[in-house]
Amino acid sequence: MSKPIRVRYAPSPTGLLHIGNARTALFNYLYARRHGGTFIIRIEDTDRKRHVEDGERSQLENLKWLGMDWDESPETHENYRQSERLALYQQYIDQLLAEGKAYKSYVTEEELAAERERQEAAGETPRYINEFIGMSADEKAKYISEREAAGVVPTVRLAVNESGIYKWTDMVKGDIEFEGGNIGGDWVIQKKDGYPTYNFAVVVDDHDMQISHVIRGDDHIANTPKQLMVYEALGWEAPEFGHMTLIINSETGKKLSKRDTNTLQFIEDYRKKGYMPEAVFNFIALLGWNPGGEEEIFSREQLIALFDENRLSKSPAAFDQKKMDWMSNEYLKHADFETVYALCKPFLEEAGRLTEKAEKLVELYKPQLKSADEIIPLTDLFFSDFPELTEAEKEVMAGETVSTVLQAFKAKLEAMSDEDFKPENIFPQIKAVQKETGIKGKNLFMPIRIAVSGEMHGPELPNTIYLLGRDKSIEHIKNML
């Protein structure tokens, strides 16, 4: 009988939730929900130097915003933060020390640096050389006594089986193996400050929490043999491992970097700009996985039902900001008005644009929005000075029939009563200009649009003219004549 599926997302509270970490959480979430398993949140906070105040809350809030829920976490269970589990780590470190599978190392940072420098100068691969090699028992005891008297605080190192082969069948990449002699020698499992290192603590945690599958980024592949060594030393069965391919920038073809200013890489950024969480969830789910077929828009429930770990990509996932924005626009276009207005309202309020026309403006520009904050630049026409025309727009307005069109349309607007000035009555006036002048198509619509709005493209022209108002529309046209 197969053991229950239990997966975890284990962030460090060292900053905002990055798109790559969000994908790790999301794939674990989808895997658990697809197979009726348990999704666990564990906080890995042993790196005290990089700890960020409020980092844990930020991580959890952004996961919730994306639409993920979990079954176990520090919110519901005790000792789900590594800093609360130090006694447990110490128990297993003491066990390994007692069994001779680990030992205290008194080598200093200066000595390690000097040895590394010597190895590099000699063209050797840097590795730790056991400081006790060649020592008799008496020499070893004397060495330890002298080091302790000098105030040297030891680390604890795992004794590596240099001839061991550490292999696993990866859920994504297939068979992978490492030789024990190629991982850099005996490595530290407990630092001088008493905190365990990541590769030791994560094994104790995963075993204690009965994690069945570890799904993470392929930057962790080099950690896996070290973790398998700990499982072996403690006599525990290792979980299954799956390493997702890295995420690359679609424009540069290089690994996604936090310095890539053309991409929004933190979930907080999407929240602040007014993206729909469902759109971001959908987009991230397709970074390195797809269900097959041409369809790209899926609800959370559909993604859970379709998720198949066998379709995780072996090739890097391309992060395309334009694709994200296209998908976001699809969600906003098809969302109900109340949802989109609620997203736009804070931006309108902050800009002092929460007027009686606010709802109509959101309705007008809803089909164009990629994020709710775009409602401000899109509505500048209604609250700011007329924009400076581009060279392309100036070229259109220099056309020989432009004056004829604008004169005729201005006359139509001036002749409309207040009662008749409605969107449904404005379009017939444009068609009347066409009939009277014989000018049609772009030569008719483009000059009117540019004269009224200062733009070649935009939402439905009659609605724009209506919301701008008859007087202001006429004023803009006069200024173009």
UniProtKB/Swiss-Prot annotation:
Q: Where is this motif: 'HIGH' region?
A: 11-21
Q: Which domain of life is it from?
A: Bacteria
Q: Where is this motif: 'KMSKS' region?
A: 255-259
Quaternary data: Monomer.
A cellular component annotation (GO) from this entry: cytosol
Q: What does this protein do?
A: Catalyzes the attachment of glutamate to tRNA(Glu) in a two-step reaction: glutamate is first activated by ATP to form Glu-AMP and then transferred to the acceptor end of tRNA(Glu).
Q: Where in the cell is it found?
A: Cytoplasm
One GO MF term: zinc ion binding
Q: What is this protein called?
A: Glutamate--tRNA ligase
Residue positions annotated to bind ATP are: K258
Q: Name one GO biological process term.
A: glutamyl-tRNA aminoacylation
Sorted alphabetically, which InterPro entries does this protein's record hold? aa-tRNA-synth_I_cd-bd (IPR045462), aa-tRNA-synth_I_codon-bd_sub2 (IPR020751), aa-tRNA-synth_I_CS (IPR001412), aa_tRNA-synth_I_cd-bd_sf (IPR008925), Glu-tRNA-ligase_bac/mito (IPR004527), Glu/Gln-tRNA-synth (IPR000924), Glu/Gln-tRNA-synth_Ib_cat-dom (IPR020058), GluQ/Sye (IPR049940)
Identify the coding gene.
gltX
Q: Which organism is it from?
A: Streptococcus pyogenes serotype M4 (strain MGAS10750)
